[in-house]
């Protein structure tokens, strides 16, 4: 299990990041930048409410909490849609901050009192929850119009543009998909259990698809020719009037990013594209999207040892030597920027930079057992979702691993999602 000291460090890091993302005036925190997203003050108090529920009340909503039941109910994500939250009588920013601080103080006391052989998983789950909401808040801030509020605090390494458009072979055969709690104590229920699957050989993009490659798709009429699109995807493209990735400006040479207007870097992974756009691009490129099983094999499997790697590059914890994570750069790195982070098959940038769409719907692995927070995965199995893998530049290193499964509706574009191609052989 993760040590109490490590958990305390991860809790502190997550909270410091959260507070940076709400370090604005009350008007900013209480407004809604887009109906797709919550007001930031809702996310802030929801983070505290979930921490209180799981770390101080054992997950029992019937046990009295720090907030009156009617107020606590405002932060139930299943009861109140994102679009409706701006109309709720939410805690003020000052009260939300104070509430989160009170909860955190008690949570640290609970962590300090945890027996040496105590189950620390619930702390890891809460850390994951806060970090995931931090990425959601970054999505909201990117939808905001007006002068910039955020600035990058970390520079990116140079890339190797010649890597764009190249592919690597992933050998066929069995591999271990998923993880067990014994090997990854912080893994969530939909990542478990580990089980052997057989995957035929295929090729996968060495790096994600770039903005420059996507511009070629646009210039070739990719958004105007139905032959590249699925029937549902084409219907959505027409309804939504899609002509380029979200945030690209007319003409496709500039974009907006967190309030900045800038030239579009040709060698940067494309982001803010939907699953429908991703599958259309893949068809145009004479390729396809990978399944999530293929993706995980390309990311984690080492055929030389016949075993999984903890990370694509090995066992070392994620740092900026290996991947662009942690939200400090506010953008993906150019392709080829992290050769040290390559997987055993030679695929690069599989963790960080952009989430990558797969063709897979969200399903439980055989032998799935829900974790203590049963509503994390189960309500979404079988729904209208596609799985995304790999994380983005906005994901905290503490929660990302090759087995981590994200999911969203196939039409979503505000997420930091891009594309990696695959080919049959």
Swiss-Prot record:
Reactions performed catalytically: gamma-L-glutamyl-L-cysteine + hercynine + O2 = gamma-L-glutamyl-hercynylcysteine S-oxide + H2O
Any single GO BP term: ergothioneine biosynthesis from histidine via gamma-glutamyl-hercynylcysteine sulfoxide
Enzyme Commission designation: 1.14.99.50
Domain of life: Bacteria
Xref: InterPro entries: CTDL_fold, DinB-like, DinB/YfiT-like, EgtB, EgtB_Actinobacteria, Sulfatase_Mod_Factor_Kinase, SUMF_dom, SUMF_sf
Claim: Oxidoreductase is one of the keywords in the record: yes
Record GO terms (molecular function): ferrous iron binding; gamma-glutamyl hercynylcysteine sulfoxide synthase activity; oxidoreductase activity
Residues that hold gamma-L-glutamyl-L-cysteine according to the record: 82-85, 408, 412
Co-factor(s): Fe(2+)
This protein's pathway: Amino-acid biosynthesis; ergothioneine biosynthesis
Keywords associated with the record: Iron, Metal-binding, Monooxygenase, Oxidoreductase
Binding-site residues, Fe cation: 46, 129, 133
Function, in words: Catalyzes the oxidative sulfurization of hercynine (N-alpha,N-alpha,N-alpha-trimethyl-L-histidine) into hercynyl-gamma-L-glutamyl-L-cysteine sulfoxide, a step in the biosynthesis pathway of ergothioneine. Ergothioneine is an antioxidant that protects mycobacteria from oxidative stress.
Similarity comment text for this entry: Belongs to the EgtB family.
Quaternary assembly: Monomer.
Annotated HAMAP family: EgtB
Alphabetized PANTHER family for the sequence: HERCYNINE OXYGENASE (PTHR23150:SF36), SULFATASE MODIFYING FACTOR 1, 2 (PTHR23150)
Protein name per the record: Hercynine oxygenase
Native organism: Mycobacterium tuberculosis (strain ATCC 25618 / H37Rv)
Source organism phylogeny: Bacteria, Bacillati, Actinomycetota, Actinomycetes, Mycobacteriales
């Amino acid at each position: 299990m993760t040590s109490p000291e490590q958990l305390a460090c991860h809790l502190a890091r997550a909270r410091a990041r959260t507070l940076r993302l709400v370090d604005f005036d009350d008007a900013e925190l209480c407004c809604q930048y887009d109906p797709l997203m919550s007001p930031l003050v809702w996310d802030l108090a929801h983070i505290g409410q979930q921490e209180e529920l799981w770390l101080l009340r054992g997950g029992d909503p019937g046990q009295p909490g720090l907030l009156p039941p009617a107020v606590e109910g405002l932060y139930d994500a299943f009861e109140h849609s994102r679009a409706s939250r701006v109309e709720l009588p939410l805690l003020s920013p000052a009260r939300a901050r104070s509430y989160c601080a009170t909860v955190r103080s008690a949570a640290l006391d609970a962590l300090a009192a945890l027996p040496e052989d105590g189950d620390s998983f619930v702390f890891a789950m809460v850390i994951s929850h806060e970090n995931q909401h931090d990425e959601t808040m970054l999505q909201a801030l990117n939808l905001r119009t007006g002068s910039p509020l955020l600035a990058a605090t970390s520079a990116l390494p140079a890339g190797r543009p010649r890597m764009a458009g190249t592919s690597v072979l992933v050998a066929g055969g069995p591999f271990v998909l998923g993880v067990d709690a014994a090997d990854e104590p912080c893994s969530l229920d939909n990542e478990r259990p580990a089980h052997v699957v057989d995957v035929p050989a295929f090729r996968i993009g060495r790096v994600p698809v770039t903005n420059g490659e996507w511009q070629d798709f646009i210039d070739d009429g990719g958004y105007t020719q139905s032959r590249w699109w699925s029937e549902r995807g084409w219907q959505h493209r027409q309804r939504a009037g899609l002509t380029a990735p979200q945030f690209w400006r007319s003409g496709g040479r500039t974009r907006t990013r967190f309030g900045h207007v800038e030239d579009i870097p040709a060698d940067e992974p494309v982001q803010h594209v939907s699953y429908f756009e991703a599958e259309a691009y893949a068809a145009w490129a004479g390729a396809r999207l990978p399944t999530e099983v293929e993706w995980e094999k390309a990311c984690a499997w080492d055929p030389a040892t016949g075993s999984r790697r903890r990370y694509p590059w090995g066992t070392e914890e994620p740092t900026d030597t290996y991947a662009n994570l942690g939200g400090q750069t506010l953008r993906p790195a150019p392709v080829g920027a992290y050769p040290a982070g390559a997987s055993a098959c030679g695929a690069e940038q599989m963790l960080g930079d952009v989430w990558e769409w797969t063709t897979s719907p969200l399903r439980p692995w055989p032998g799935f057992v829900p974790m203590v927070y049963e509503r994390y995965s189960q309500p979404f199995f079988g729904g209208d979702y596609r799985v995304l893998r790999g994380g983005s530049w906005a994901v905290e290193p503490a929660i990302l691993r090759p087995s981590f499964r994200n999911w969203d509706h196939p039409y979503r574009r505000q997420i930091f999602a891009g594309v990696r191609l695959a080919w049959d052989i």
